[in-house]
């Protein structure tokens, strides 16, 4: 199992809309998340920053992320969410959400 933490900015004028959208995530998007081996997925907000955490339980992370990106309903969802977000300037090339390094964990 792989734990993933990510961060991204949120446009200040989109906070309420982003929270409304995520209060009713489309069932097809939730099904794709599950089909791509993502579990225990949460997004937290602090001011204009979003922190996402999930656990990946599959065997091929890159293939599952490509599968998610190829899903038509997920891509449609992203047309709503991406304009609300503000990627960090420090993100790696090709990243939208900036991956974070895990520095501590305990069960």
Role assignments for model-derived ranges:
Residues 14-39:
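Short amphipathic alpha-helical segments
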Residues 30-51, 55-59:
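Short, glycine- and small/hydrophobic-rich beta-strand elements in well-ordered beta-sheets
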Residues 11-13, 57-59, 103:
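Generic structural motif
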